Amino acid sequence: MKNIFLIPVLFLFLFTSCETEPGVSEAFAKYKHQNGVTSITVPGWAIRLAARWGDLDRNERELLQSIDKVKILAIEDKDLNARSNLHKEFYSAVRENSEMEELMVVRDGNDQVTIFGIADEKSIKELLILVGGDDNAMVYVKGRLKPELISRFMDENPQKGFLSFKN
């Protein structure tokens, strides 16, 4: 009897834990298995483990501990990149079918970058960076990011920048 009750609860948990924003899940489903595409998903437990054991200062550690999931999709193949525009392809799906609001838009020549987010008065719960044009990428961050923590991190690390892979 316990198994009959446990199985539906387990499936419900799995389906809700895998849920992501419209546009994000579509992009990953379409591109993650294609050659020339880098797809990275980092779960919260791995991020918190890195925060605990990494050689980080207090602000870096606190920032990492506030992140529950990171998903990155980048098109690196030149031919596929020339035929694709992630911004054009998924902008409408995110804008129309999501709770996310546009936080910032940058257009420079052929490149388009839009940052979407879901926030309350205390934190940013979800952040989506959508890049299309000459370069195509999508970065999705879910967690409880405090704006003052991001600001402090950027002030203390101006050479690195936020969400930068520079050393």
PLM region descriptions:
Residues M1-I4:
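Positively charged n-region of N-terminal signal peptides that target proteins for export
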Residues L14-S17:
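C-terminal motif of bacterial Sec signal peptides marking the signal peptidase cleavage site
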Residues V24-F90:
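Early exported N-terminus immediately downstream of N-terminal targeting peptides
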Residues V37, Q65-K69, S98-M100, D108-N110, ...:
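Extracytoplasmic
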Residues A93-A119, L163-N167:
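Short Gly/Thr-rich strand-loop-strand
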Residues F116-P147:
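A short, solvent-exposed beta-edge/loop patch
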Residues D135, V141-N167:
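C-terminal partner/receptor-binding element of secreted or periplasmic proteins
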